């Protein structure tokens, strides 16, 4: 998306000006990928830590299979799965750590469901998970603008002369974890199939980058959805410029409701 941004200045919502009033091709703060390794490590470390130490609990998978994938002995896993007093559960709401041993120090195996999902199930789960995430992140994002402590953490995300794709990742670690955990919750609460999750992730990431692209993309998702449903990059660009309103990531319903009741904070994040 950075390449698209640099090669299509005519799509930019607001072009940063130089000292002599000329258009700036590359906004301040935009860096080459080779200079962003530290940022990548910061972003990935907490996610990798969770991914490599916690057993994955996918829908339609037995607790026994889950525990076996977490390096628990098959017999012990079967006993635990059938013991009503066991502390192990197949729900994601009760995390289970990998049984770390010398031979298996990290969680590298996944217990997968035996059967593939129907296309209808995948479509419904994708729609439901994005709807749930949109509502949850609306509340999370609103809190980042009204609660003093987390407001300070969120402020750097708004410090830029011109919004551009790399702003997507200009986040405090608290915000990063919030993004990922809310996305996981949205998938898990409806017991989505692992294949749905596989499709959800690239769509989720792409839409986040598109929102921060600073571009009026001809193929923007808000142009594909029914009119008024999708917020899109323009709405999010206005949010970054004003600081208030536009808390919903993908759609518009919750923001519209907040505006109707008249409680949408308007101040800019500093």
Map each language-model feature to its residues:
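Non-catalytic, topology-defining segments of multipass membrane proteins
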Residues: 1-155, 159-187, 248-270
């Amino acid at each position: 998306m950075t390449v698209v941004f640099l090669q299509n200045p005519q799509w930019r919502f607001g072009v940063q000006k130089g000292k002599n009033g000329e258009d700036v091709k590359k906004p301040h703060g935009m860096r080459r990928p080779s200079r962003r390794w530290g940022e990548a490590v910061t972003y990935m470390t907490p996610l990798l830590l969770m991914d490599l130490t916690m057993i994955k609990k996918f829908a339609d998978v037995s607790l026994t299979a889950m525990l076996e994938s977490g390096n628990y002995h098959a017999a012990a896993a079967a006993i635990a799965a059938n013991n009503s007093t066991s502390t192990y559960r197949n729900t994601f709401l009760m995390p289970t750590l990998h049984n770390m041993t010398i031979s298996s120090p990290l969680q590298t195996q996944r217990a997968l469901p035996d059967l593939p999902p129907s296309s209808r199930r995948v479509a419904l789960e994708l729609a439901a998970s994005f709807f749930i995430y949109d509502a949850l992140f609306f509340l999370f994002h609103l809190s980042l603008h009204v609660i003093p402590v987390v407001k300070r953490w969120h402020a750097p995300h708004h410090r830029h002369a011109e919004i551009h794709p790399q702003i997507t990742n200009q986040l405090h670690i608290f915000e990063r974890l919030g993004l990922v955990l809310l996305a996981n919750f949205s998938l898990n609460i409806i017991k989505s199939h692992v294949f749905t999750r596989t499709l959800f992730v690239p769509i989720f990431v792409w839409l986040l980058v598109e929102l921060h692209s600073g571009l009026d993309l001809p193929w923007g998702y808000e142009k594909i959805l029914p009119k008024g449903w999708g917020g899109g990059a323009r709405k999010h660009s206005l949010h970054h410029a004003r600081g208030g309103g536009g808390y919903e990531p993908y759609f518009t319903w919750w923001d519209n409701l907040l505006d109707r009741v008249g409680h949408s904070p308007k101040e800019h994040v500093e």
